[in-house]
Swiss-Prot record:
Alphabetical keyword list: Cell membrane, G-protein coupled receptor, Glycoprotein, Membrane, Receptor, Transducer, Transmembrane, Transmembrane helix
Membrane topology: Multi-pass membrane protein
A cellular-component GO term for this protein: plasma membrane
SUPFAM superfamilies (UniProt xref): Family A G protein-coupled receptor-like
Annotated stretches, region: Disordered: 307-346
Record-stated family: Belongs to the G-protein coupled receptor 1 family.
Highest rank taxon of the organism: Eukaryota
Residue intervals passing through the bilayer: 20-40, 48-68, 91-111, 133-153, 179-199, 223-243, 259-279
Compositionally skewed regions (Basic and acidic residues) per UniProt: 307-330
UniProt organism field: Homo sapiens (Human)
GO molecular-function term, one example from the UniProt record: G protein-coupled receptor activity
Record's function text: G protein-coupled receptor that is activated by short chain fatty acids (SCFAs), such as propionate. Hence may play a role in the regulation of whole-body energy homeostasis and/or in intestinal immunity.
Protein name, entry field: G-protein coupled receptor 42
Subcellular location(s) per record: Cell membrane
Length: 346
C-alpha cells in the first residue's frame, strides 16, 4: 500500500482501539488471576482433567494480557510501532497464538464435559489427567505452529521493509507477503476455528439434550451458562475475526475493518472467566471462598487503616494541646509571682 511517510495505514480512531485494549486489560487481568489461584488450589487438592485444560486456558489468557500493553503503546502512538522491532513479531505471535488457543481449549473442555455425562462409567476408569496434559501440549503446539507465520511474514523478502512502509507492525503487507499470508489465514480459520466450533457445538448440544431428560435444575442452569459463555466466545469474539480471513482470501487483501474484529477477539480474555465459573460447582464454591477471604482481608486492612488514622489524629491533637497548656501554666506562674511580690511590699 502506497502511503506518505506522515500518513497512517489505519484511518480509524486509534484511541478507541486503545480504550478497548485498556478495558480488556483492567477487567481480564484480575479475573484471570483469581481463576489461576482457584485452579492451582484445585489441582493441588483434588486434580481433575478438565481443570488441567482450564488452567492452560487461563495461562493463555494471562499471556495475552501481559503482552497487551505493547498493543496499547502501539494504539496510543497512532497505530505506529515505537518499540524495538524484535518485540513486533513476538507480540504478534503471542497475540494470535493465544486467540486460537482459546478455541482449541474450549473444544477440549466440551469433549471432557460430554464424555463425563454421556459415558460416566467409562470416563471414571480412564487416566484423564495424563491425557489432559497431552491434549494441552498438542493445543499449544498446534496453535504456535500456525501462528509462527508471523515470523515468516515479518522476515520474508526485503528485510528493510519488513516492518511496514510506515513503521507499522503486522498491519501493512506487500503482495509477496499476502501471497503467503492469506492462504495460511484461511487454513487457520478452518482448522483452528471451524473444526473446534463444530466439535463444541456437537458436544454441548448432546450434553444439553442428555441433561434435559434427567439432570437436576441446578446442573441444567450451570450447563446453560457454560454453553452461553462458550458460544459467546466463538460467535461474537472469534466469528467476525475468522470471517475476515475468508473475506481477505477472496478479495486478495486484508479488509480495512479487520482491526475492529481483532478487538472483539481480545475480549475473549474477559469472557473466559465466565466459562470457568460455569464449568463446575467446585470452581464456584472455591471462587466464592476466595472472594470471601479477599473481602475479609480488605475489611481488616480498612479497619487497621482507620485505627492508625485515629491514632495519628489523636497524636496531632495532643501535640496541639501542649502549647496551650504551657501558656496557661506560665500565666498562672506569673500571677503567683506577682502576688508574692505584692505581699512582700506590704
Amino acid at each position: 500500500m502506497d502511503t506518505g511517510p506522515d500518513q497512517s495505514y489505519f484511518s480509524g480512531n486509534h484511541w478507541f482501539v486503545f480504550s478497548v485494549y485498556l478495558l480488556t486489560f483492567l477487567v481480564g487481568l484480575p479475573l484471570n488471576l483469581l481463576a489461576l489461584v482457584v485452579f492451582v488450589g484445585k489441582l493441588r487438592c483434588r486434580p481433575v482433567a478438565v481443570d488441567v485444560l482450564l488452567l492452560n486456558l487461563t495461562a493463555s489468557d494471562l499471556l495475552l494480557l501481559l503482552f497487551l500493553p505493547f498493543r496499547m503503546v502501539e494504539a496510543a502512538n497512532g497505530m505506529h510501532w515505537p518499540l524495538p522491532f524484535i518485540l513486533c513479531p513476538l507480540s504478534g505471535f503471542i497475540f494470535f497464538t493465544t486467540i486460537y488457543l482459546t478455541a482449541l481449549f474450549l473444544a477440549a473442555v466440551s469433549i471432557e464435559r460430554f464424555l463425563s455425562v454421556a459415558h460416566p462409567l467409562w470416563y471414571k476408569t480412564r487416566p484423564r489427567l495424563g491425557q489432559a496434559g497431552l491434549v494441552s501440549v498438542a493445543c499449544w503446539l498446534l496453535a504456535s505452529a500456525h501462528c509462527s507465520v508471523v515470523y515468516v511474514i515479518e522476515f520474508s523478502g526485503d528485510i528493510s521493509h519488513s516492518q511496514g512502509t510506515n513503521g507499522t507492525c503486522y498491519l501493512e503487507f506487500r503482495k509477496d507477503q499476502l501471497a503467503i499470508l492469506l492462504p495460511v489465514r484461511l487454513e487457520m480459520a478452518v482448522v483452528l476455528f471451524v473444526v473446534p466450533l463444530i466439535i463444541t457445538s456437537y458436544c454441548y448440544s448432546r450434553l444439553v439434550w442428555i441433561l434435559g431428560r434427567g439432570g437436576s435444575h441446578r446442573r441444567q442452569r450451570r450447563v446453560a451458562g457454560l454453553v452461553a459463555a462458550t458460544l459467546l466466545n466463538f460467535l461474537v469474539c472469534f466469528g467476525p475475526y475468522n470471517v475476515s480471513h475468508v473475506v481477505g482470501y477472496i478479495c486478495g487483501e486484508s479488509p480495512v475493518w479487520r482491526i475492529y474484529v481483532t478487538l472483539l477477539s481480545t475480549l475473549n480474555s474477559c469472557v473466559d472467566p465466565f466459562v470457568y465459573y460455569f464449568s463446575s460447582s467446585g470452581f464456584q464454591a472455591d471462587f466464592h471462598e476466595l472472594l470471601r477471604r479477599l473481602c475479609g482481608l480488605w475489611g481488616q486492612w480498612q479497619q487497621e487503616s482507620s485505627m492508625e488514622l485515629k491514632e495519628q489524629k489523636g497524636g496531632e491533637e495532643q501535640r496541639a494541646d501542649r502549647p496551650a497548656e504551657r501558656k496557661t501554666s506560665e500565666h498562672s506562674q506569673g500571677c503567683g509571682t506577682g502576688g508574692q511580690v505584692a505581699c512582700a511590699e506590704n
